[in-house]
C-alpha cells in the first residue's frame, strides 16, 4: 500500500454532515496545492436495502469506492460520472451529494466529493485501474472496504439512501445576460452575454449526470437559452411557462406555487430554469413547509439547486454555485 493511502486514514478532514450540502465557486478555499477528485457510492436494487459496488484496484491492492481526479475543464458532477463510467463501465444517475473528504497526498491535499449514484445500465469489465467489482450489501461493504474513511462515506450514503427522494428538481438560475440598463427593448428578450452562453454550455456536463427527463423554463429568453443546449443534448423540448418566472411569483404567488408542485408531482427528475427572485423565495417556502431548514439560500446566475422530495415534501437540497470548471 502506498504512503498516501495510509495517510488517508491517519490524517483527514470530513464534510459529510447534513441533508443540505453545497459546492461553492472555490471548492478548495483555504487549501494550498489542492488535487480535486470526485466519486460515488454506487448502488442498485432497493434504496432501503441496496447492493453497493466496491472496486478492487490492483495498483494499490485495496478495496475502495470508485473515484478519480478531475481533468482541466471539468466540473465535479461531470468528473464523478466520467470516472464511474471509466472504472466500472456503468451508466449511473447521480443523486444526493454526500459531502467531501480531504487528506494529504505527497505534499498536496486531495479533496474528494462523493455522491450516491444509482446504476441504470452497463456492464463491468476488468481494466488497468480496476480488476474486480463486487456487489455486496451495506454491512458486507463496511467489512470489505480497506479504508475507514471510505466506511464513513458509505455510512453517510446509507443514511441518505434510507430516504431516497421520489422526485428531484434541478432548479437553475439563468446564465449571465446583457445589462438591463443598456437594454432598451422588451426585458424578456434580453439575451445571454458571452459568459452566460458559456455557463449554458457547461451546465450540460454538470446536469447530464442527474439524467433529467423534462425541462421547463420561465418566459424570458435568457432562461430558455440557458437550458436549450442541455435540452439539445438530451433530445428534449423546453416547455416555457410564465408561471415559473419572477412576475408570476410577485403577481400570482399561489398559482406559481401550484405550478411548481405540479412538476414535483410528476416524479423523476425535472429541470426548471428561472430567475433570481422566484428561486430563493420558492425554496424558502418549500423549506418552511417541509422538513429541511435552510437558513441561507444563495442564487447566483448560472447556479443550480438540486432539490429532493418525498411525497411532495422537501427533504434534501444541494447547491452548486457554478458549472464553470473547477480548474
Language-model segments: residues:
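Short, well-ordered beta-strand micro-motif
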Residues: 42, 56, 114-118, 135, ...
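Conserved Nudix-box catalytic region and its N-terminal flanking loop in Nudix hydrolases
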Residues: 48-91, 183-190, 195
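Nudix hydrolase/Nudix homology domain
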Residues: 2-4, 61-62, 124-179, 183, ...
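Acidic, metal-coordinating catalytic segment for phosphate/diphosphate chemistry
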Residues: 2-39
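A short coil-to-beta-strand element that immediately follows conserved catalytic motifs
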Residues: 91-99, 237-241
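Active-site-proximal alpha-helix that buttresses catalytic centers in soluble enzyme cores
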Residues: 68-70, 79, 166-251, 280, ...
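Unchanged
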Residues: 70-93, 101-152
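Active-site-adjacent alpha-helix immediately C-terminal to a catalytic or transition-state-stabilizing loop
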Residues: 257-314
Amino acid at each position: 500500500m502506498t504512503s498516501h493511502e495510509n495517510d488517508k486514514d491517519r490524517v483527514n478532514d470530513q464534510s459529510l454532515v447534513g441533508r443540505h450540502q453545497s459546492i461553492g465557486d472555490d471548492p478548495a478555499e483555504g487549501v494550498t496545492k489542492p488535487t480535486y477528485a470526485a466519486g460515488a457510492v454506487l448502488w442498485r436494487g432497493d434504496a432501503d436495502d441496496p447492493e453497493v459496488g466496491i472496486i478492487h484496484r490492483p495498483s494499490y491492492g485495496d478495496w475502495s469506492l470508485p473515484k478519480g481526479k478531475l481533468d482541466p475543464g471539468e466540473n465535479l458532477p461531470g468528473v464523478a460520472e466520467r470516472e464511474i463510467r471509466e472504472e466500472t463501465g456503468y451508466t449511473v444517475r447521480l443523486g444526493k451529494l454526500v459531502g467531501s473528504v480531504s487528506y494529504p497526498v505527497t505534499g498536496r491535499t486531495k479533496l474528494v466529493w462523493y455522491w450516491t449514484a444509482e446504476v441504470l445500465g452497463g456492464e463491468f469489465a476488468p481494466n488497468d485501474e480496476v480488476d474486480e467489482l463486487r456487489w455486496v450489501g451495506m454491512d458486507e461493504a463496511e467489512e470489505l472496504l480497506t479504508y475507514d474513511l471510505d466506511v464513513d462515506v458509505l455510512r453517510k450514503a446509507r443514511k441518505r439512501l434510507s430516504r431516497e427522494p421520489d422526485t428531484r428538481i434541478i432548479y437553475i438560475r439563468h446564465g449571465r445576460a446583457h445589462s438591463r440598463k443598456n437594454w432598451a427593448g422588451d426585458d424578456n428578450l434580453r439575451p445571454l452575454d458571452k459568459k452566460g452562453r458559456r455557463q449554458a454550455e457547461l451546465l450540460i456536463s454538470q446536469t447530464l449526470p442527474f439524467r433529467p427527463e423534462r425541462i421547463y423554463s420561465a418566459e424570458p429568453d435568457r432562461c430558455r437559452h440557458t437550458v436549450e443546449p442541455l435540452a439539445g443534448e438530451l433530445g428534449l423540448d423546453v416547455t416555457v411557462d410564465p408561471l415559473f418566472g419572477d412576475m408570476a411569483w410577485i403577481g400570482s404567488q399561489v398559482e406559481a406555487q401550484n405550478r411548481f408542485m405540479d412538476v414535483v408531482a410528476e416524479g423523476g427528475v425535472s429541470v426548471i430554469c428561472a430567475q433570481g427572485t422566484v428561486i430563493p423565495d420558492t425554496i424558502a417556502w418549500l423549506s418552511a413547509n417541509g422538513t429541511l431548514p435552510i437558513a441561507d439560500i444563495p442564487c447566483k446566475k448560472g447556479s443550480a439547486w438540486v432539490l429532493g422530495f418525498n411525497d411532495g415534501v422537501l427533504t434534501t437540497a444541494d447547491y452548486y454555485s457554478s458549472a464553470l470548471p473547477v480548474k
